[in-house]
Amino acid sequence: MRILTRAGAALAGASLLAASAGLGPAQAIVGGYQVEDGDLAFMASIQTAGSEGTDGHFCGGSVVSSEWVLTAAHCMEDTKPSEIQVVVGRTNLDDTSGGQTLTADRIEVHPDYADTQTFDAALIHVTTPIESPAIELVPLGEESLEEDGAALTVSGWGTEFFGSPFIPAQMKAVDVEAVADENCTTNALMGFQAESEICAETLGGDSCQGDSGGPLFGSLADGRLVQVGIVSYGLGCATPKFPGVYGEVNNPSIHDFITSTVG
């Protein structure tokens, strides 16, 4: 059963926020810390077309090439490219003096998402080259960052507590730890799928509504920063014993979908 996504406000009449009540999508970052201007430059804000500041923000994303932004499939359900814009290079969404506001001309959703509600990954193609740097995907088969207790970070502009109607302008991040599949059994009632999803948590910290589609990332032994997950869903936000759930970038089908689409 999939009723737990962490998308933010409604888009084009689709009430994503209403769907996030109780068991629902990930909201803003709970706990954590504010991100300094210029840091995490691969972050993207997915917004309603024509909006300004935080008004239209409903999901996060990550720059994965000069033309493509990775986000969650549930963020793009029943959505046309003309209905959205992508903001990059802006840590504070109210500071419009920097960064880029980009139009989209193509949305690709993982082909298996509609049937399963898993494989929660989508890609947005923008019409203008992205100036911000891309984040590298975790190499296929590299599982060190999915081991129990591995240090990870999730970031975004989601709400700061479950049910809040307010999107913060300043990006936040929270450091979390990976939860091994065998230790994420409490999420079984939400339909957790170990083959295509991963879990992460920390006491008092989590992603939340408005963070859906944003990246879960960490550093490999050689120091490279890589994306290992896509914010997907959870039971409320920072609910004890119920880790946040993320689309698994290391899943062969998700990894191939991203790399074959981006080229």
Question: What do these predicted regions represent?
Answer:
Residues 30-38, 85-132, 143:
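Conserved catalytic-core segment of clan PA serine endopeptidases
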Residues 100-101, 117-203, 251-258:
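Chymotrypsin/trypsin-fold serine protease catalytic domain
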Residues 43, 49-66:
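A conserved glycine-rich beta-strand in the N-terminal activation segment of trypsin-fold
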Residues 1-28:
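Secretory targeting and sorting signals
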Residues 59-62, 206, 213-215:
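Beta-propeller and closely related beta-sheet repeat lectin domains
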Residues 49-51, 74-78, 89-94, 112, ...:
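Acidic glycine-/aspartate-rich tracts in secreted/extracellular proteins
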Residues 27-51:
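N-terminal activation segment of mature serine protease catalytic domains
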Residues 2-6, 23, 44, 62-76, ...:
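C-terminal subregion of chymotrypsin/trypsin-like serine protease catalytic domains
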